[in-house]
From Swiss-Prot:
Record SUPFAM superfamilies: PLP-dependent transferases (SSF53383)
Pathway stated in the Swiss-Prot or TrEMBL entry: Porphyrin-containing compound metabolism; protoporphyrin-IX biosynthesis; 5-aminolevulinate from L-glutamyl-tRNA(Glu): step 2/2
Descriptive protein name: Glutamate-1-semialdehyde 2,1-aminomutase
InterPro entries reported for this sequence: 4pyrrol_synth_GluAld_NH2Trfase, Aminotrans_3, Aminotrans_3_PPA_site, PyrdxlP-dep_Trfase, PyrdxlP-dep_Trfase_major, PyrdxlP-dep_Trfase_small
GO molecular-function terms, A-Z: glutamate-1-semialdehyde 2,1-aminomutase activity; pyridoxal phosphate binding; transaminase activity
Known EC number: 5.4.3.8
Species of the source: Ruthia magnifica subsp. Calyptogena magnifica
EC class: isomerase
Compartment(s) of residence: Cytoplasm
UniProt record similarity statement: Belongs to the class-III pyridoxal-phosphate-dependent aminotransferase family. HemL subfamily.
One Pfam assignment: Aminotran_3
GO BP terms, alphabetized: protoporphyrinogen IX biosynthetic process
Length: 428
């Protein structure tokens, strides 16, 4: 038994399932999770000091790699003055100004402590501002674990949905319509029936929790047009894509302006943080300016704010940052696909900016949750463990996107491609 297995057994005695977030338990791939002790650049090191090339990047947060010194120095400097005050600080305003500068759709922004808190608050704000109760979300898009968003689709577009977790009252389902991602006709159909009752449409502009699924041509643009037509607030959940696929997020990448945006991950430099923001007229409905209540003891924590500000400053200084990052992702995925083809293994890939998805399928494209579920999940599980043995750490689920950081070198990318080649040989 290695150190990770020993620690996992110990963790299970005091933590439900031994983890503080379910995907970490390796239930999606089998086996025991790896316990890490440190990160450095593109690498993670486990309790036995084995080194891994990391493509999870703390679920997308570590776009500069682990222990980036600019971020570390900012955090150390800030914490020497105190861990938090529960009161306003200048650094909150500076980060808010930077977010508004980089994302023009955001005129006012409120800091919170997680992505779930951001989406939950944005939904409440949309309902409070419009006076409507219904929301539309899309199958396979994850927006955190608040009750309103843990609803799966019914048998038809307007059929009552079903909670995806015990503990979520069935009454919540009547207010949440879950549609197929990238299905424009279905959105048109539903809005034509109940558009006057819908407060908002919330969508991951690039879905990252059914692996990596980009929007088909026109999907986001039509959502924008339909929301304008029916007076519905368009919410982009950019917790994953914000500052990851482009400096201005997916909304800049696809040139579509939402009314509200939720943020997390990169905006905190790797520390716990979230944010939601958007049009001034909508954001002014939030307390203390308006009647929609939202609050948080740790919101705007100065350590998280300082890490996020340095992160965004670094990203915005290099105009070639995202071009270089995408070049790395393209090299990685094209190399892996070539190795798969050499071994007669069906595989396709999706790439947007600094994120990617690999799918074991003979299909040329994967565009929604149903198509992701039809991929060869069992083959992915075997591939995951073969890559782990090669010292490559990928997301422990066929439904999670992968991420490259600026710290990944050409050698890291090539070593990963070579490792995939050896793994494919063992799969055949």
């Amino acid at each position: 038994m290695n150190q990770s297995e020993t620690l996992f057994a110990q963790a299970k005695t005091v933590i439900p399932g031994g983890v503080n977030s379910p995907v970490r338990a390796f239930n999606g791939v089998g086996g025991s999770p790896i316990f890490f002790t440190r990160g450095e650049g593109a690498y993670l090191f486990d309790e036995d000091d084995k080194k891994y090339i990391d493509y999870v990047a703390s679920w997308g947060s570590m776009i500069l790699g682990h222990t980036n010194q600019a971020v570390i120095i900012a955090v150390k400097t800030t914490l020497e003055n105190g861990l938090g005050f529960g009161a306003p600080t200048q650094i909150e305003t500076k980060l808010a100004e930077k977010v508004c500068e980089l994302m023009p759709s955001i005129e006012l922004v409120r800091m919170v402590s997680s992505g779930t808190e951001a989406t939950m608050s944005a939904i409440r704000l949309a309902r409070g501002h419009t006076g409507r109760d219904k929301i539309i979300k899309f199958e396979g898009c994850y927006h955190g674990h608040s009750d309103s968003l843990l609803i799966k689709a019914g048998s038809g577009a307007l059929t009552l949905g079903v909670p995806t977790s015990p503990g979520v009252p069935k009454d919540f389902a009547k207010h949440t319509l879950t549609l197929e991602y990238n299905n424009i006709d279905q959105v048109c159909e539903v809005l034509s029936e109940v558009g006057a009752e819908v407060a908002c449409i919330i969508v991951e502009p690039v879905a990252g929790n059914m692996n990596c699924i980009p929007p088909i041509d026109g999907f986001l643009q039509v959502l924008r047009e339909l929301c304008d037509e029916y007076g519905v607030i368009l919410v982009f959940d950019e917790v994953m894509t914000g500052f990851r696929v482009a400096l201005g997020g997916a909304q800049a990448f696809y040139n579509v302006k939402p009314d509200l945006t939720t943020l997390g991950k990169v905006i905190g430099g790797g520390l716990p943080v979230g944010a939601f923001g958007g049009k001034r007229e909508i954001m002014q409905s939030i307390a203390p300016l308006g009647p929609v209540y939202q609050a948080g003891t740790l919101s705007g924590n100065p350590i998280s704010m300082s890490a996020g500000l340095v992160m965004l400053n670094v990203l915005s200084k290099d105009e070639n940052f995202y071009t270089i990052l995408n070049t790395k992702v393209q090299k990685l995925t094209k190399g892996i696909l070539a190795k798969a083809k050499e071994n007669n293994i069906g595989m396709t890939a999706n790439v947007v900016g600094g994120m990617f998805g690999l799918f074991f399928t003979d299909s040329q494209s994967v565009t929604n949750f149903k198509e992701t579920s039809q991929c060869n999940i069992e083959l992915f599980k075997k591939f995951f463990h073969l890559m782990l043995a090669e010292g490559v750490y990928m997301a422990p689920s066929a439904y999670e996107a992968g991420f490259v950081s600026s710290a990944h070198s050409d050698t890291d990318i090539q070593n990963t491609i070579d490792a995939a080649g050896r793994a494919f040989i063992k799969l055949t």
